[in-house]
Every structure is written in C-alpha cells, then in structure tokens.
Amino acid sequence: MEAVKHLSAAAAAAAAAATCSDSPAKAAASPAASSDIAEALGELKASATAAASSASKAATSKHHSNNNHKPSAAATATAAHKKSESCNSNGNKCTAATSPIGSKTSNAAMAAATATAAAATNDLAAAAAVVLSLQGTMVSSLQQAALLPANSAAAAALNLQALESYLALQRLTGKSDVFRFSNSNTGSSNSNNATTCNSSSSEADNNALPSLIDIANIELKSSCSSSSSGEPPLTAATASAAATSSPSSNNSNSTSTPTTSKCVPLPSIGTVSAAVAAAAAAAAAAASQQAALDCATAAELAAECDLPLLDGEDALSFEAGDLDSSYGSFMFNPSAFSQAETDSALHSLQATMYQDKMSVISGAAGGVGAGAVGGLEEAGSSAAAAAAQRSKKQFICKFCNRQFTKSYNLLIHERTHTDERPYSCDICGKAFRRQDHLRDHRYIHSKEKPFKCAECGKGFCQSRTLAVHKILHMEESPHKCPVCNRSFNQRSNLKTHLLTHTDIKPYNCASCGKVFRRNCDLRRHSLTHNLSAGVGGVVGGNLSDPFGSGSSSSSELGLPTGSASTAASSRDLVAVSD
C-alpha cells in the first residue's frame, strides 16, 4: 500500500513537470521526478506479492469499507494507471517513462479485482445453497403436514418447522452482508485547457453482484473461460472496473450507468399462512370423507351380519370378544354407533315377527316325521334368535337356570318348582299361584261372565278364555298340524300335538331317568319326587298323595290302574296347570 501511494505521488509530480517543461528551471526538476518514479517502481516490484495478499484480505473485509472516503488498493492502482495514460502530448518524455508502470499496475489491479469477485461469488454461492436448503425444508414440511390429520400434534410440529424455516429465510435475505444490491456511482467531469482523468468513485466491492438465478451462469462462464485461455477469468466486477477507466482529451465527458441486480422474492408470511390453512382444510375434508365412508361401510356390515340361529337346547353366551382393529373409526364414531343401535332394534322387531309366523311356515315342510321335527326345530330356533336380540336377562331361576327380565316373573316361576299357592278362594278353598288367576276364578262363583264374544255372544269368565274362543270363528286356524291337518286354537297345544307324531321324548327326569314328551309332564313328575321326600318316601309300594284327594301315582310307576285313579290323575293335572 505504501508503494502504491509513492507511485501515485511520483506520477502526479511527473505530470506537473511535463506541463511546465517550457521554463528551464522546471525542466531541470524533471530528472528528479523520473528518479522518484524509478524508486517507486522498485518498491512496487518488491511488494507485488504483498499486493495480492492485501487484495484477498480486502475481499473478506469489504463490508467495513466506506465508498466515499477510503478507496481500495485496486481502485487506487486503476486511478494511477489512468493518470499515467492521460498525460498531455506535450510531455513525450513523461509519457514514455510512465507507460511501463501503467501496464504493470493495470495487471495488478485486474488480478486483485478478479480475486475479489471470485471470493464474492463463492460467498454468494454458499448463501444460495443455504437458502435453497431452507426452502426445501419448508416445502417438505408443508407437504407432510397436509397428509396428516388437521388437529394432530405431528401436523402442528411440521407447520411450526415450516414457519421457522420461512422466518430464517426472511432474516437471511434481509442482511446486506449476504446479498448486496448496490448501484455504481456516477462520476462526470468537464475539463477545458487541461488534461484530466475521469474515474468512478466506487470501489470494486460496490459493483453489482449476480443474483441467485445468475450464479449457475456465472460459474459456467468462468469455467469455460479458464479452460479456453491461460489468462485469469474476468467476472462482472472486473469488467465493470475496466469499463470505468478511459483516457480523455481536453474536452471529454464520461458517465457510468448504474446497474442494479434483483433477487427472486420469497413468499410473504400471509402467503405461507394461507398455504398452511389450505393444507389443514384439505386434511379436514379428507378426514370427514373417510369418516362418512366408514359410517356407510359399518351400516352395510350391520345390515348383512345377522346372528346365527340357536338350537332349542343351546345356551346363550355373552362372552366379550376382541374388537377388530380395522373398525376403530367406526367404534368411536357417534353417528355410526347410533345407526348400529337403530339397526339392532329393527332386527329385534323382525325376529319377534318371524317367531309368530313360524307356525304357518312349518306347514310347508315335507314328510310325516321329518316335517314335524323340522317345524319344531325352526320354531325353537326362531324363539332362540328372538331371545338373543332381547336385552340381557338378569334374574335366573335357581332350580332350572331359566332367565327372566323381571323379578316378579321369576317369583311366579319358582312357585312352579315349590308348588306354592298363596292365593286361595274364600268360597271353595282352591289355591292359585297368581292373584289374577284368583280374580278370574271368582267369576265362576258369581256366575258373572263379563267377557263376551262379538261373533256368537258367548260369555266367558276369563279374558284368556275368550281369546282362545275367538280362534274358533276364524276360517282357518293359524295353528294347524302339517301332518294330520288338525287345527288348534292355541300354539302350545299344536306343539304338544306335534310330539305325538314322533317318538322323541326330549324331557328326562334327573332323579329316575324317565323321559317325557311334554315339559309339563316332567314338572308334574318332578313334584312327586320332591313331595315324597318330604313325607318319608314310599309306603307299601305306593307314593303318598300330595294333594290329599286319594289319587294314586301308580300310572307313573307303570302299575295297573283303575277308573278311579285315572280320574284322580286328570284332576291333579288340572290343578298343577293352574
């Protein structure tokens, strides 16, 4: 730097001596100025390497320089070169003496400017790589967040990451140290009667740098120029510095046009927020569409998947099974769950209606024995299916494990096992298990028949008796045997009659192993075992009379019976059935 300063001072002295060569005294001072220039040239040669290193250091510390006060070494060397070339034609000796110095100074300035531009290009390329990486991170985060549910924690984290990347981009592009967009100053001068040199006052650091889009083109041109010639490549900064130095005549006007480089603008925070909101809305729409599809699929499955029919002897089980993981969205969807409950209620109603029509459908069965058994099994299956659709039965009989939904029904049922009859008639003393049966019985003593038939006008003491009577007025009884076409006014009578066409005796006694066709026969037989154990067992080969009517149970034991015992047994059957 000191050598360049001496060189500038010597060049100025030589120019002054050349302009004043008319007087002998000033001509004598010219050799002294030439000697000063020679000494400065020697010092410049000695510090050639120092100038290159100082130029590279100047490139790293270029943001600390002031454009209006501290010119760089490259600009000073360029100015000295222009001054040495702009000497007047009257001083031929001065021009000849300073021309070698100007050429070497120009080479040094070009080298320094090239190094500065290369360093700036490398810095800009690194900054561009960081910017592109942040942009890629932001875009990938937004894309991944759009694929996730709107209210999930992962989507919120990805949106936050995208916002942080955007803010980092805004801070990075807002720094002048990373992206500089400066205008080259305009310098102009008008000179008359004197030789002047016009140069730009801006440093090489203030020249316009390439934008992000032009980085690839600059590097491509640099590689092509370096491979084609051995000369150092000239960048946009070097070309701009060379264009600012031009020799001028007595009347010259020079003007440098300012150039400005622009970068691709990044999206604003409003644009990013709108993109995030649009992605969240798209994710919410996709989730709602998937929920609607799951709801429709669940409704179809609920409509198609009916419970299999159970046999008459199969017990109902309410074991809980593992849920299928593929129906997670259906199980936690309130609308789909309510739809499933509605479908379940509809299926229960259909099963109940199906049970009432089974007796009519059983008439289509073919064969004598097979048709009867098939109709019975279908009736039992329908009853079991209807029972499966009903609510859980909480009250269980301790004798036969039969289930009931109400405690009163369980109490009445257990009285069939214990033969408890707490309601007795005060007129005849007959006892009943239920109070409504006693009320209907009292109409017999009063001769009152409040229940009249609308068809024939016949009166009945009990409402259930009238209901049974109305079936007789129908054109075709709904309870008809498919084997012998016999009609019955009660369904229970038809079921009992169907067993007479087969040899099936499904009811067996647990105490003695005897089998029966009807359940009522088995219950009556079981009562004989319970009551005989209470009075002391069998005496003289005959069971004790449980009803106190002198009846004998010899018919159950296979003993010969008379007419009196047969009549007593029929009376016992009527009493138990009540």
Swiss-Prot record:
Has two temporally distinct modes of expression during early embryogenesis; expressed in seven stripes at the blastoderm stage. Also expressed in a non-periodic domain at the anterior of the embryo. During gastrulation, the seven primary stripes are supplemented by seven secondary stripes that appear in alternate segments. This results in the labelling of each of the 14 segments in the extended germ band. Expression is relatively weak at the blastoderm stage, gaining in intensity at gastrulation. Expressed in the invaginating stomodeum and proctodeum of the embryonic gut. GO terms for cellular component: nucleus. PROSITE patterns: ZINC_FINGER_C2H2_1, ZINC_FINGER_C2H2_2. One of its GO terms (molecular function) is DNA-binding transcription factor activity, RNA polymerase II-specific. One of its GO terms (biological process) is positive regulation of transcription by RNA polymerase II. Residues 183-202, 224-261 have a biased composition (Low complexity). A zinc finger (C2H2-type) spans 395-417, 423-445, 451-473, 479-501, 507-529. The keyword Transcription regulation applies. The keyword Zinc applies. Residues 55-92, 183-204, 224-262, 547-578 are annotated as: Disordered. InterPro entries: C2H2-ZF_Transcription_Reg (IPR050717), Znf_C2H2_sf (IPR036236), Znf_C2H2_type (IPR013087). It is found in: Nucleus. Keywords: Activator, Developmental protein, DNA-binding, Metal-binding, Nucleus, Pair-rule protein, Repeat, Repressor, Transcription, Transcription regulation, Zinc, Zinc-finger. Coiled coil: none annotated. Its main location: nucleus. Pair-rule protein that determines both the size and polarity of even-numbered as well as odd-numbered parasegments during embryogenesis. DNA-binding transcription factor that acts primarily as a transcriptional repressor but can also function as a transcriptional activator, depending on the stage of development and spatial restrictions. May function redundantly with odd and drm in leg joint formation during the larval stages, acting downstream of Notch activation. PANTHER family: ODD-SKIPPED - RELATED, PROTEIN SISTER OF ODD AND BOWEL. This is Protein sister of odd and bowel. The gene is sob.
